[in-house]
């Protein structure tokens, strides 16, 4: 079928001072998980975002490395790059180590790969996103190797879709799940009222992640 190849804008990135020790990890009881050996070792996490700064001290050692660990459908960067910062932030929340300070990710011993879904202008077409999903199924294009990620994170959503279920990427997501890959989407920034999560996060196929603040109030 023929459909409009819509364009998606990159999420807004917030910048601040170096982070203090992360209260959220204690709320989620991450130290208890680490103490029994669940720190992400042996797990590969993929990020669909604005890219990743692979030189970041808390992420450099965790990059899996190689041609099967980075994909830029726009052809702008042959190696990991992030001209925005959003993808580096979300990756650090997941797998950041403690080298650069006191902050640390939820799974600091996991390794990462990434798709630079948005171009340097902060835009991604639907066709770019479909290509990204396809790459994640078989990063090196060789069915005889096992190099797909264990988890895919997508901290983006289709703006203006709160309360609507858009199925544009349902087949892509289902293909990942059928391959044994866990898929997580950010619920979006339209909360905290009911029925404000965005698509694809509000699709039943995915794990949808929201947020709370330090007082455990639901974030926007």
Functional labels for PLM-detected ranges:
Residues 2-5, 56, 139, 203:
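Acidic-histidine catalytic/liganding microenvironments
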Residues 7, 118, 189:
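Residue-level "edge-of-site" marker
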Residues 21, 32-69, 74-128, 144-151, ...:
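Subtilisin-like serine protease catalytic core
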Residues 24-31, 190-192:
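Short gly/ser/thr-rich secondary-structure transition/capping motifs
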Residues 123, 157-181, 186-220:
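Substrate-binding/specificity loop regions of serine endopeptidase catalytic domains
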Residues 136-164, 186-187:
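Short acidic, glycine-rich surface-loop motifs adjacent to enzyme active sites
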